Regions:
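Beta-lactam-recognizing serine transpeptidase/beta-lactamase-like catalytic domain environment
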Residues: 8-55, 60-175
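Short, basic/aromatic recognition patches
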Residues: 1-4, 46
């Protein structure tokens, strides 16, 4: 209500077993008023909605760097610019950040440029392999029939850069 949101979704999961205990997708609907409703409300946003995850995806970029032993929490990235250009795209920071940040600070301060630098260190193949090992880029199997497909794309240096901070790479909230 405070933000005038028109929809949302949430999943309650058992962290030990991975079992889905509950999921909700809003807005919901009243079947007594089904003829006066927008058809979009019948979409389960958890399983069928495909979205860019944005800055949440930086955790996967950092995890890929840690998993491949290319970074640690204290690895310092020096001379981070507040914006960089990749082909026709400009990547920038939301806020002005210090020029030197370690891995932990990149996550805490949500640095787009820091995430790009980590992804560049990882490289396309290792990054793709890491995401595939988590099945983030694949359609999931689930008890409900309505499950969305992550959007396929061609990898390149700019896709690696934007994917590192969750842009241009899509998946369902359930994934």
């Amino acid at each position: 209500k405070d933000f005038n949101n028109i929809g949302g979704a949430a999943v309650l999961m058992d962290v030990k077993s991975g079992e889905i205990l509950s999921l909700i997708s809003l807005p919901d609907y009243d079947l007594n008023k089904r003829y006066s409703l927008d058809s979009n409300i019948y979409t389960n946003k958890i399983t069928l909605g495909v979205y860019e995850l944005g800055s949440v995806f930086k955790t996967f970029t950092v995890a890929a760097g840690l998993e491949n032993k290319l970074i640690n929490p204290n690895t310092v990235f020096q001379n981070l610019e507040n914006k960089l250009t990749c082909d026709k795209y400009t990547i920038s920071e939301h806020d002005k950040l210090p020029k030197d940040l370690n891995t932990e600070q990149i996550l805490i301060r949500s640095s787009n440029i820091g995430a790009v630098r980590i992804a560049q260190k990882i490289g396309i193949e290792k990054y793709k392999n890491f995401l595939n090992s988590l099945k983030i880029l694949q359609k999931i199997k689930f008890d409900l029939h309505e499950v969305g497909d992550p959007t396929a794309f061609n990898w390149g240096k700019c896709k690696l850069a934007t994917a590192s901070f969750g842009h241009g790479i899509t998946t369902t909230p359930l994934q």
